[in-house]
Amino acid sequence: MLTAITGINWGDEGKGRMVDLISQEYDIVARYQGGNNAGHTVKNERGKFVLNLLPSGILRPDVVCVMGNGMVIDPHHLDGEINKLREQGISITPANLKISDRATITMPYHVDQDGLEEARLSKTGAQFGSTKRGIAYTYGDKYMKKTLRMGDLLHLDDSVHKRLVTMVDSKNLVMEGSYNAAPISVDEMWAWLEKYAAIFKDYICDVGQYLADADAAGKKVLFEAQLGALRDIDFGIYPYTTSSNTIGAYAPIGAGIPGHKLTNSVGVMKAYSSCVGDGPFVTELAMTEEEKHALREAGHEYGAATGRPRRVGPIDLVASRYGVFCQGCDEVALTLLDVLDYMEKIPMVTAYKLSDGTTTTRFPMGEALDTAQPVVEYLPGWHCDITAARKWEDLPKEAQNYVEYLEKAVGCKITYISVGAEREAYIHHVV
């Protein structure tokens, strides 16, 4: 069984929390794209955990975690993340963590270039809101065949050294010529690679074969996405996207088993909207600054990876319907419903008014999206604490009505509803 858990919106939907919940039913959890540019926050009986690179299944002792070939991995960050979790009592060994030999390495100069370019763009207001983790530059070099992969750490021989020299020479033309930065040292980069080769050599393997064998043996595999459909490099709000494919259809490819097909796709959707970074975000126009501040504080909307305040707004049903379509969702997990407890009436963006005066429920692109205005409708709020609810019947009628409205609006059944940060604070809603 191959299941993908993906984001329906801009990311930060609560995928890590849902993976932590659902992974108890699975043998393997695999990340298939992205790097340490976004974070998954999981709170359970053992504490609060922030994960950037590691799959959320790492918090379950009986689950094997896989980092697939579609990922870009900063070994320095990964080492720190592993050590932090070990300090929190989480066991991480080659037995429960396997890293693809085909995953691309984020080098220190990728991170440096990201920061330098964002600083350059910010002078003219043209920045993208990068997390400055080197993600775009790693993926860019991957497609130009100018970087190394984790498998190269297993044989740091003369051929790898020659490739490194060529890559550094090419990168220095940019670093010195465009940014007037200090040149990159081949010797320093080689020492850096040797350090992390020693740390990760026992974790690196052919994860594609591992997953194929596991699937053939009847093991259950859960694919974990980073970010959401609206950040996908092809189907997201370009150019305000990430540099990888966040959609579930890419999961088997990015994990290492490209010939396999998903059995089930679970899309994760917030009960309201949030976004980190620049680009059009129509729903934020539906609230006053005071209303947005109240929602941000109620939802603790600050980036797990960056700490930046997230942009917020009502749930955007135009964007969410498009996200469900992109992800091919069979079911939806609705998160953070309890955040809306304080609202007397619940706003929803149900359509966009375009600059030509027309109204649409289809998600537009380009200039049409840039200038779109939200059409807002309201449902009565429940205005009470729902964090103790564990069954559908425990929810106030107003909360039930809201969930049912969302189901019809996005065209997909909602089977999970989270009503709190703790692991057990959810409702499994099967009709």
Model-derived regions, located:
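Non-transmembrane, aqueous-exposed alpha-helical and coiled segments at domain scale
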Residues: 1-431
